[in-house]
């Protein structure tokens, strides 16, 4: 637990609060000093303020909040749930309890879409399992002429996407639907681009994840069944891929050990009406993004 400083030993300056917080966070897996500075940067509004205000007193109301944040982080609550926002593809997104925190590796999905649609930008985008909305909002910001639909079955992601839609001035271009993936979309409606980052962690592996994930992130957004592939079977087996226009793309994130399922001998390599799947590796060499192009 956090040792609340007594009145006579309470830190005064920003720098002295950083020393205290670093000491309190030494048991974390991440470097304590970096965590302490990151929380302070969010508190003050920028990393530069941590430097320029280092010798200045931290106002009492901010000091109280900093103590609360450090205590929450010491209990392994994720950094971005404490601050309430996360950077993704050049923008800040709101995040909240009950919503999967966007990961840096997911930016590869957005990058691949950007690279492959330069000559023919999508006009309509569908995301299955919208979560925070980081993927579809980033894509809509890349393509000012596009509109999008995001589907999620849980209320917390819908609320979070509403916040980010407003935050990024996308109210008129992003439509949100709550429900099962295909059942929520009007019959016959097709899109130039379908994207998804579905749950892909094998059920037996969930409890072995970091405490921040196991204790604070929604298991429904993580658990992909016995082999982690249940949601891909659901998406591809329900013919929701027919929602992709001729010439359009279907792009999904996969787990680090799932490349085999989408390459030549895998069950998802060839889909009727699509070119064979292409697997793109992340910076660590793991298959991370799968791309299918609809023929026509």
Provide a role label for each language-model segment:
Residues 39, 76, 106, 135, ...:
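Residue-level signal for inorganic ion chemistry
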Residues 25, 117, 165, 239, ...:
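Conserved hydrophobic residues forming the short capping helix/wall of the S-adenosyl-L-methionine
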Residues 104-208:
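Conserved SAM/SAH cofactor-binding pocket of Class I
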Residues 2, 38-115:
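Conserved AdoMet
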